[in-house]
Structures are given as structure tokens and as C-alpha cells.
Amino acid sequence: ECCHRQLLCCLRFV
């Protein structure tokens, strides 16, 4: 998952 590798991606993923 994006969140797993990049925190920024996590913000967009949520």
C-alpha cells in the first residue's frame, strides 16, 4: 500500500 511506503500517499489514500 502507498501508506506503507510514503506517508504523503497515505494522506491522499485515506
Curated annotation (Swiss-Prot):
Valine amide: residues carrying this PTM: V14
Q: Name one GO molecular function term.
A: toxin activity
Q: Which residues form a coiled coil?
A: none
Keywords recorded for this protein, A-Z = Amidation, Disulfide bond, G-protein coupled receptor impairing toxin, Secreted, Toxin
Where does it live in the cell? Secreted
User: Which superkingdom, per the lineage?
Assistant: Eukaryota
Q: Does the keyword Acetylation apply?
A: no
**What tissues is it present in?**
Expressed by the venom duct.
Q: How is it modified after translation?
A: Contains 2 disulfide bonds that can be either 'C1-C3, C2-C4' or 'C1-C4, C2-C3', since these disulfide connectivities have been observed for conotoxins with cysteine framework V (for examples, see AC P0DQQ7 and AC P81755).
Which coarse location class describes where this protein primarily resides? secreted
Q: Which GO terms describe its cellular component?
A: extracellular region
Q: What else is known?
A: Negative results: 5-10 uM of the toxin does not have activity on 30 different class A receptors of GPCR, voltage-gated sodium channels (Nav1.2, 1.3, 1.4, 1.5, 1.6, 1.8 and the insect channel BgNaV1), voltage-gated potassium channels (Kv1.1, 1.2, 1.3, 1.4 1.5, 1.6, Kv2.1, hERG and the insect channel Shaker IR), muscular and neuronal nicotinic acetylcholine receptors (4 subtypes) and neurotransmitter transporters (3 subfamilies).
Q: Tell me the protein family, please.
A: Belongs to the conotoxin T superfamily.
UniProt domain comment: The cysteine framework is V (CC-CC).
Q: State the protein's purpose.
A: Interacts selectively with the G-coupled somatostatin sst3 receptor (SSTR3). It displays antagonist property for SSTR3 (Ki=1.5 uM). Other somatostatin receptors are also affected, but with a lower selectivity: SSTR5 (Ki=80.2 uM), SSTR1 (Ki=169 uM), SSTR2 (KI=159 uM), SSTR4 (Ki>100 uM).
Name of the molecule in the record:
Tau-conotoxin CnVA
